């Protein structure tokens, strides 16, 4: 069976996901077969595996860092919020239904066999399992039925690294308070604490680190710097949306829907030096972009209503009539159509039908069975400015409850309006390059001036940079002693 180490945090966004990815990469570089694991993840940003299972993207990133194929066993329970008090529950990659938060809380221990089966299966195949917790183990109101933090650590007998975020302040209180709120048994599981997202001279921290070790009774296992790496992890979501980029040579405006999902669909455009990708949630901020993109959403009808009430729908329609390129993905694609109906209340929005934006001749009906599959092929029948896509390969995945009449092929177009059900459709560098070349031609600027790069080599380099920082920041001899149960 595999050795294991678990990364828990003092709070959400402490940097657990990225640190786990970095540790996966370090261990891979050191010659180990390593796999990530998170028993329960709550996220709208999901991925479809080769066998059609749905899992959280954080574990996909960690699997990529480890150099292995993403597998739903790495994230056996995925919760996708549908309302403020309920989620769609996905177990082993398949939808089980929608549950209110309290009902799920009462029933989640019934899922322990699924969690353990997934973990034990991975542990038989790999040398090391890097486990990520969720939120904080100090949420004492949730400890009784916990299956993702100390509850899971007990089930799989995992040693724990506790991570605190110094960038938001109060890291010593975070770490000491979290340790203090654990039972004696669980405190013994904490083998080291990590100060994460540090900026500055470590020497300034040393007196505090020494006192922290004395108070907690465990060693400081590392001080990891604030990382400037370009990796699609969930902890970067608020930072990504918070950027107020000024328009560059090519300006792309992405609509920041309230229930946005798979925001990483547009990440490829961010990596060109002279392309700006702005997330917009107010009509006055739309300005005059070269392309408007409408992302996927967990609640198409509710977000279409928001788009209408905010004035953004009218602004998008006006821009489209003036020749601006508009591109919708999944839920955004459905919104661009004429009509959406939900007779079975799949989205539980309290609305059975709604008119769409009327920019594509599309009729969408939501059904109970979810489409979830990887897809790839060659573009054909693409008209208009992006016609150069024809003959080029694409790869991605579909996750949606709705079926749309008139939807043909991977990309449906009418004039300057385009739509697709395929998440990740821009990930192939040739696809992103072709779209940007077309936008450059329309604008009369040189594509070469955008700054080009090798996307695959770039991604691998980012994982290596992450590993370099994690290796330098962590006490790796201590980490290996923890893995070998010598601490």
Predicted segments with their positions:
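Flexible phosphate-sensing "switch/lid" loops adjacent to ATP/NTP-binding sites
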Residues: 1-320, 325, 342-345, 368-369, ...
């Amino acid at each position: 069976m595999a050795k294991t180490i678990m990364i828990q945090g003092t709070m959400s966004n402490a940097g657990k996901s990225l640190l786990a990815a970095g540790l996966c990469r370090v261990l891979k570089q050191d010659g180990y077969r390593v796999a990530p694991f998170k028993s329960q993840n709550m996220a709208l940003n999901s991925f479809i595996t080769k066998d059609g299972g749905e899992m959280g993207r954080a574990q996909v990133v960690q699997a990529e860092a480890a150099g292995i194929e993403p597998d739903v066993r790495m994230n056996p329970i995925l919760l996708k919020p549908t309302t403020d008090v309920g989620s769609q529950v996905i177990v082993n990659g398949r939808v089980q239904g929608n549950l209110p938060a309290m009902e799920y809380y009462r029933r989640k221990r019934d899922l322990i066999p699924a969690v353990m089966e997934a973990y034990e299966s991975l542990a038989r195949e790999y040398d090391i399992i890097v486990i990520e917790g969720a939120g904080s183990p100090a949420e004492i109101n949730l400890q009784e039925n916990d299956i993702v933090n100390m509850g899971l650590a007990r089930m799989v007998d995992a040693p724990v690294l506790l991570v605190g975020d110094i960038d938001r302040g109060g890291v010593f209180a975070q770490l000491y308070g979290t340790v203090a709120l654990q039972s004696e048994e669980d405190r013994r599981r904490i083998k080291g604490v990590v100060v994460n997202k540090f900026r500055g001279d470590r020497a300034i921290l040393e007196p505090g680190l020494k006192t922290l070790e004395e108070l907690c009774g465990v060693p400081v296992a590392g001080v990891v710097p604030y990382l400037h790496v370009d990796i699609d992890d969930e902890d970067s979501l608020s930072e990504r949306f918070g950027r107020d980029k000024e328009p560059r040579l090519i300006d792309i405006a992405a609509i920041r829907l309230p229930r946005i999902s798979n925001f990483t669909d547009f990440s490829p455009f961010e990596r060109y030096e002279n392309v700006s990708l702005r997330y917009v949630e107010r009509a006055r901020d739309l300005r005059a972009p070269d392309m408007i993109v409408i992302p996927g959403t967990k609640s198409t009808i509710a977000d279409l209503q928001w788009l209408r009430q905010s004035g953004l729908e009218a602004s998008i329609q006006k821009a489209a009539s003036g020749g601006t390129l508009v591109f919708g993905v999944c839920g955004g694609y459905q919104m661009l159509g004429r009509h959406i109906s939900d007779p079975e209340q799949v989205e539980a929005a309290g609305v059975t039908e709604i008119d769409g934006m009327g920019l594509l001749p599309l009729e969408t009906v939501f059904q109970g069975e979810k489409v979830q599959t990887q897809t790839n092929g060659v573009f054909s029948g693409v008209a208009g400015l992006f016609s150069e896509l024809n003959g080029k390969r694409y790869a991605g995945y579909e996750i949606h409850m709705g079926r749309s009449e008139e939807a043909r092929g991977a990309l449906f177009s009418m004039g300057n309006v385009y739509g697709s059900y395929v998440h990740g459709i821009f990930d192939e560098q040739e696809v992103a390059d072709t779209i940007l070349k077309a936008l450059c031609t329309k604008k009369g600027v040189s594509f070469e001036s955008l700054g080009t790069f090798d996307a695959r080599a770039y991604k691998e380099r980012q994982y290596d940079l992450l590993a370099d920082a994690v290796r330098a920041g962590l006490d790796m001899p201590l980490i290996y002693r923890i893995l070998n149960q010598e601490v």
